[in-house]
Design a protein with these regions (language model features):
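Short, well-ordered beta-strand micro-motif
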Residues: 17, 88-92, 109-111
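A short coil-to-beta-strand element that immediately follows conserved catalytic motifs
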Residues: 64-73
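Active-site-adjacent beta-strand/loop module that shapes the phosphate/pyrophosphate-binding cleft
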Residues: 75-97
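Conserved Nudix-box catalytic region and its N-terminal flanking loop in Nudix hydrolases
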Residues: 22-60
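NUDIX/MutT-family hydrolases
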Residues: 99-127
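Conserved N-terminal beta-strand and adjoining loop/helix that marks the start
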Residues: 1-23
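Hydrophobic pocket-lining residues within nucleotide cofactor-binding pockets
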Residues: 44, 93-94, 98, 112
Length: 127
């Protein structure tokens, strides 16, 4: 696989964590999507499985140790410089207290998805 192809595509993961019919969302404080709500997630690193990547991202962004369940969705996002292949997993449990890193300014549990969201996560509340 050429380096150009690797630069044009990246695989990302995100986690849907629903508790008491509310979904956990984070508010970005850095570009891209500064000021927008999103699911916890990020890019898969070399030699990492998709589930390992999501566990790492949850730990980095929230300080939570999570149990990752099944794939519940996915999508492709085209940006100006690459294509993101995003795999969405259900998070079926978590331990610890939420402590944000420097990528997010706040978190919230939502029964309705805020208008300023990166993506419409509402379908995950209807499960």
């Amino acid at each position: 696989m050429s380096r150009d192809l690797i630069k044009k595509y990246c695989v990302c993961v995100e986690g849907v964590y629903v508790k008491k019919n509310k979904i956990l969302l984070m508010k970005r404080c850095v570009i891209p999507f500064k000021g927008f709500w999103h699911l916890v997630g990020g890019q898969v690193e070399k030699n990492e499985t998709l589930k390992e990547a999501l566990k790492r991202e949850f730990k980095e962004e929230t300080n939570l140790d999570v149990k990752v369940g099944d794939v519940v969705g996915g999508r492709i996002e085209e940006t100006f410089d690459r294509t993101k292949i995003i795999v969405t997993f259900e998070v079926v449990g978590a331990q610890g207290e939420i402590n944000l890193n420097d990528e997010n300014s706040e978190y919230g549990w939502f029964a309705k998805i805020p208008r300023n969201s990166v993506y419409d996560f509402g379908k995950f509340l209807q499960r």
